[in-house]
Amino acid sequence: MFRLLKRACSFLLLFVIYQSFVIHHNVQRVLAYKPMVEKTLAENDTKANVDLVLAMIYTETKGGEADVMQSSESSSGQKNSITDSQASIEHGVNLLSHNLALAEEAGVDSWTAVQAYNFGTAYIDYIAEHGGQNTVDLATTYSKTVVAPSLGNTSGQTYFYYHPLALISGGKLYKNGGNIYYSREVHFNLYLIELMSLF
C-alpha cells in the first residue's frame, strides 16, 4: 500500500513539474508579443492595458497561432481568416477597447467587457439590464438562452469542459454557446502570467 502511494505521489509530482514547464513555456511565448501589444495600445485611445491583452492572448491561443487573439470571427465572421499576429492584435485591441467604452457608458463592470469579447457586445446591454455585474450565473443563462440558440443549439445541449475554473462550477458548457468562464479565465491568467514572469 505504501509503495503504491509513493508511486502515485511520484507520478503526481512529475505531472506538476511537467505542467509547470509547459505553462512557463506558453507564458514566455505570450510575453514575446508584449512589444507588439504595447505599440498597438499606444496607437489607440483605450482603457485596455498590456497585462489584460496578454492575459487574453494566453486565454485564446497561448500565443501558439497566427491569429493570437482569435480575432477572425469578429472581423470577418469566419474562423482563421486572419493569418497575421499584428492584424490579430490590432483587431482584438480595437474590439476590446470598444467593449470597455460601451461597458463604461452602460455602467457595468469591466469584466463584462472582457466576457463580451467572447459572447459579443450585446452581452454588455444584457448585464446592464441584470444588475450591472458579470457573474457566472448570468453568463450561463446568456450562453444558454442567447448565444447557443443563435448558433443552432436550441435544445440546450452541453459538453464537458476541462478547465480548473470550469470544474469548480460543474464543468459544462453549452454547445455553440461560447465560454461562460471566459472572463474568469482571463482574470486567472493575469495572475498566472505575473507569477510565471518571475522565473
UniProtKB/Swiss-Prot annotation:
It is found in: Cell surface. It comes from the Bacteria. InterPro entries: CwlT-like_lysozyme, Lysozyme-like_dom_sf. Its main location: other. Gene3D superfamilies: 1.10.530.10. It holds the Pfam family Lysozyme_like. One of its GO terms (cellular component) is cell surface. This is Pneumococcal vaccine antigen A homolog. It comes from Streptococcus pyogenes serotype M1. The gene is pvaA.
